[in-house]
Amino acid sequence: MKLIFLSGVKRSGKDTTADFIMSNYSAVKYQLAGPIKDALAYAWGVFAANTDYPCLTRKEFEGIDYDRETNLNLTKLEVITIMEQAFCYLNGKSPIKGVFVFDDEGKESVNFVAFNKITDVINNIEDQWSVRRLMQALGTDLIVNNFDRMYWVKLFALDYLDKFNSGYDYYIVPDTRQDHEMDAARAMGATVIHVVRPGQKSNDTHITEAGLPIRDGDLVITNDGSLEELFSKIKNTLKVL
């Protein structure tokens, strides 16, 4: 099973490339942002159950029939509450270093130092709170920058190893947004493919939307024509793997 990591800014054709491979080859897909969406969908469900906020399911966090840039009009205190719940969800999947303590009855809670760190990070963010901004805050501003830089890579590695002998020809990771994630992928023997649309730049200033550098050994698909031309380039690229 060949491991492929895709990279590209918004609207570069990266997701179209992943979908084409999934539809036309024996392939399985893993999203690094999948656990982020899972955790926030769970946390939102707990939070919104006692408020007048709208119901947002996993589908909305995936962006299906929903604009993830929509302002949710959350206060910072409400965001902190959501993040606490998201941390609890994630810790149940794979422990987050230095976050949780247990009381005499065995009940789990966020420790004082970790809570202060979460609070400080959220209080220093002045952006409007949308689904996308919640994802960036949990995935990068909190977990990667303050608790465990390799946390999302570890979750990917567990899934990859579980599927290693599953019979698929390709294992696709379509949403790599940080250099350390891509470095880990290269170390694991992944083929890195950058999908580039000339002149396409992201207006999102968050680090996860800045695009990644092309390293020696990486492959590049230039998406500068029709869909049919893009599909032809994908086929030709996969032939050389």
Swiss-Prot record:
**Acetylation is among the record's keywords:** no
What catalytic activity is recorded? dTMP + ATP = dTDP + ADP; dGMP + ATP = dGDP + ADP; 5-hydroxymethyl-dCMP + ATP = 5-hydroxymethyl-dCDP + ADP
Gene3D superfamilies assigned to the protein according to its UniProt record, in alphabetical order: 1.10.238.70, P-loop containing nucleotide triphosphate hydrolases
> What positions does the entry give for dGMP binding?
K10, I36, K37, R68, R132, G139, T140, V144, W152, D175, R177, Q178, E181, T208
Q: How is its activity regulated?
A: Inhibited by pyridoxal 5'-phosphate and diethylpyrocarbonate.
Q: Which InterPro entries does UniProt cross-reference here?
A: DNMK, DNMP_kinase_N, P-loop_NTPase
What keywords sit in the KW lines?
A: ATP-binding, DNA replication, Kinase, Magnesium, Metal-binding, Nucleotide-binding, Transferase, Viral DNA replication
Binding-site list for Mg(2+): Y42, Q85, E108
EC code? 2.7.4.-
Q: Which cofactor does it need?
A: Mg(2+)
Q: Which residues bind ATP?
A: R11, G13, D15, T16
What Gene Ontology terms describe what this protein does at the molecular function level?
ATP binding; deoxynucleoside-phosphate kinase activity, ATP as phosphate donor; dGMP kinase activity; dTMP kinase activity
Subunit comment = Homodimer.
Please state which protein family the record places this protein in. Belongs to the dNMP kinase family.
**What function is annotated for this protein?**
Allows the synthesis of deoxyribonucleoside triphosphates necessary for the rapid viral DNA replication. Phosphorylates dGMP, dTMP and 5-hydroxymethyl-dCMP (hmdCMP) while excluding dCMP and dAMP. The phosphorylation of 5-hydroxymethyl-dCMP represents the first step in the replacement of cytosine by hydroxymethylcytosine in new viral DNA genomes.
* Protein's name according to its UniProt entry: Deoxynucleotide monophosphate kinase
Please tell me the species this chain comes from: Enterobacteria phage T4
Record gene name: 1
